[in-house]
Amino acid sequence: MAALAAGLSKQRAAAEGLGSNQNAVKYLGQDFETLRKQCLNSGVLFKDPEFPACPSALGYRDLGPGSPQTQGIVWKRPTELCPNPQFIVGGATRTDIRQGDLGDCWLLAAIASLTLSEKLLYRVVPRDQSFQKNYAGIFHFQFWQYGEWVEVVIDDRLPTKNGQLLFLHSEEGNEFWSALLEKAYAKLNGSYEALTGGSTIEGFEDFTGGISEFYDLRKPPGNLYNIIRKALCAGSLLGCSIDVSSAAEAEATTRQKLVKGHAYSVTGVEEVDFHGRPEKLIRLRNPWGEVEWSGAWSDNAPEWNSIDPQKKEELDKRAEDGEFWMSFLDFLKQFSRLEICNLSLDSLSTEEVHKWNLVLFNGRWTRGSTAGGCQNYPGRVHRGSG
């Protein structure tokens, strides 16, 4: 009876707008505006009691209390790391994201794709934040969780070693939006270590509330290039990776400098005239910001000398650090899976516009019966009754 009443209460609140991006649910009951006002009035910087700067926030095993990896970690605010910290410098871009000592490349790939759309980015990363005006050591971010937007509040104490950020950081040493976003997502998931080894599509969904689909690149549909092109034009988020057969292969580098088990963002496609025939190209980004494809159509590859110089210059300008072009055929040979998070309810697989109908059911997983697994293992086993 209590569960029914709670469900009805939630439905009523949703009908009144609670859980929308404009009126997000307050995670753990923490209200950003109220807490910031209290800190400004008292003159004391915010310290988050729900996600304190202590070993438990780092992790539970490899980053757990007493782990050798956590020795020497000091939590510092950006104001202690540089003289003029900024939330965002010159607009958030995909080059703002550099991976640190945490295996969350999947999350970085999702964040990099998020920066391709300012509208999407500022839905997750509210603009009203600064280290100057109304600074109180408190920041907030929004994530999509179980059918509603949730606002997560954090303080700005970040884990460092030797005066440098330990995890996600920006190329600009005084820019902190990406490091703070990672901390908010870690809080939502329980710890930083909980972010290790996820799936890019999980990040896409949590940042957008979009509908995701998966393509096995060993058996791609014939129109996949057009699907990707249309998805990018529609503002969808795309990621890809190379499957590994064992843990020993994880993050091993191929002869042509691709990293196995590593998440890449898909950031563009282009068709060029190459020796009198059309050549389909695709642009990818490694969240590490380095270690790029060294095969055909890579930086300084001879293929670039056989296309129109103006086109070459145009494509050069579009590629940022850590980004590279490769032929679409090589992409299909080298990569194992493609994940697309659709923000529009239009179908991507045809030129015609089809609308989806969305029906939302709230329920729960039951351990040993209906509980699902990590999205890294999407296989389903139907368990019969009786």
Set out the residue ranges of the language-model regions.
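Structured alpha-helical subdomains that flank or immediately precede key functional sites
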Residues: M1-G386
